[in-house]
C-alpha cells in the first residue's frame, strides 16, 4: 500500500515536471555523466541489481556519477526498472537546483550479447527514460554499429552524420515525462554522444573476449560509441587464465591504450585496493562497488577515486 501511494505521488510529480519543462533551461545538459566525461574528467559508478525503492533513493542522493542497472545477470523486468527510475526522482534536488539534470545517471546493462543483434530490448529501456545502455559481449564493429543504431531515432530527410542510421521506433511517452521535456525536445536530445555533441544518451560497449580485442580499433572507432567497459572476469575466462595473470592484465592495458589513443573513456570494475592505480592509468569510467549499495567499502573506493581524479 505504501509503495502504491509512493508511486502515485512520483508519477504525478514527474508528469507535472513535464508540464513545467519550459521553465527550465532547455539547453542544460541532462546527462551529468556525459557532462563529466566531455570535460575530460573521470566518472565513477556502481553495478546494481537491487531495484528497490529504498536503494533507488539512497543511490540518487549519493556522490556516484552513474548506476549500471544490471539486467544481464539479474532479471530483465521493465516494470521494476520503471519503479527504480521513479524512485531516483529527487524532488528536493530539482527544487534546490531548478534543474532537471539527475545527480546520478541511470544506465542499463542489457542481457543480450552483441552477436544476438538485439534491438527491441534497447528500445524498451530507453522508452522508460534511462540515459544510457551498456552492451555486453560486443565482438565486432558490425555488432557495435547495431548497438548504436538501436539507440537512435531515424534521421530526418536531409540530416546526415558519420553514424549508423537509427532503428529506434517512436513511442517515447514515458521517457518524455521522465526527462521532463517536451516531445520534440526529447527527440532532439535523445541521441548518442559524442556523435551528437548535444546528445544525452551514452552508449557503452563492453569488451570481454579475445575476438573483441582483435577487432578493437574497429569497435572503438565506431561513430556513436561513448565509452568502453572492460569485463575482466569474462575476459580472463575467455583467455583461460586467472584474472590476476599478467596475460590478462596485458590485455586490459591493450584495451585501455587504444581508448586513450582515440579519446574514448574506458571503464573497469575496481575496489578500494586498486581504484587509485586504475584512475592514474587513465580509466575514466570505473565502477567502485556492487549490490551492497553505498557500503563503507564502496564509499571508500569512491572517495579515493574522486580524490585521485582531482574531483574533490
Please give the residue ranges for each predicted region:
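Bacterial N-terminal signal peptides that target proteins for export
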Residues: 1-12
Amino acid at each position: 500500500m505504501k509503495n502504491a501511494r509512493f508511486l502515485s505521488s512520483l508519477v504525478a510529480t514527474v508528469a507535472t515536471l513535464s508540464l513545467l519543462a519550459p521553465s527550465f533551461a532547455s539547453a542544460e545538459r541532462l546527462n551529468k555523466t556525459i557532462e563529466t566525461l566531455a570535460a575530460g574528467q573521470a566518472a565513477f559508478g556502481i553495478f546494481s541489481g537491487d531495484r528497490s525503492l529504498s536503494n533507488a533513493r539512497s543511490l540518487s542522493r549519493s556522490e556516484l556519477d552513474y548506476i549500471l542497472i544490471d539486467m544481464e545477470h539479474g532479471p530483465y523486468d521493465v516494470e521494476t526498472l520503471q519503479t527504480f527510475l521513479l524512485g531516483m526522482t529527487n524532488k528536493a534536488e530539482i527544487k534546490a537546483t531548478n534543474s532537471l539534470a539527475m545527480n546520478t545517471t541511470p544506465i542499463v546493462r542489457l542481457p543480450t550479447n552483441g552477436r544476438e543483434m538485439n534491438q527491441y530490448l534497447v528500445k524498451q529501456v530507453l522508452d522508460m527514460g534511462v540515459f544510457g545502455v551498456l552492451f555486453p559481449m560486443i565482438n565486432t564493429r558490425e555488432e557495435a554499429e547495431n548497438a548504436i543504431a538501436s539507440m537512435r531515432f531515424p534521421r530526418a530527410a536531409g540530416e546526415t552524420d558519420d553514424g549508423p542510421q537509427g532503428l529506434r521506433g517512436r513511442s517515447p511517452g514515458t521517457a518524455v515525462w521522465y526527462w521532463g521535456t517536451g516531445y520534440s525536445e526529447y527527440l532532439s536530445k535523445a541521441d548518442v554522444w559524442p556523435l551528437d555533441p548535444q546528445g544525452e544518451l551514452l552508449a557503452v560497449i563492453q569488451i570481454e573476449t579475445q575476438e573483441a580485442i582483435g577487432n578493437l580499433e574497429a569497435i572503438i572507432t565506431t561513430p556513436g560509441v561513448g565509452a568502453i567497459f572492460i569485463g575482466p572476469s569474462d575476459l580472463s575466462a575467455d583467455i583461460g587464465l586467472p584474472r590476476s595473470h599478467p596475460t590478462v592484465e596485458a590485455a586490459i592495458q591493450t584495451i585501455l591504450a587504444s581508448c586513450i589513443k582515440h579519446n574514448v573513456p574506458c571503464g573497469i570494475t575496481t575496489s578500494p585496493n586498486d581504484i587509485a592505480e586504475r584512475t592514474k592509468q587513465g580509466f575514466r569510467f570505473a565502477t567502485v562497488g556492487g549490490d551492497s549499495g553505498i557500503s563503507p567499502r564502496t564509499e571508500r573506493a569512491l572517495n579515493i577515486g574522486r580524490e585521485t581524479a582531482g574531483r574533490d
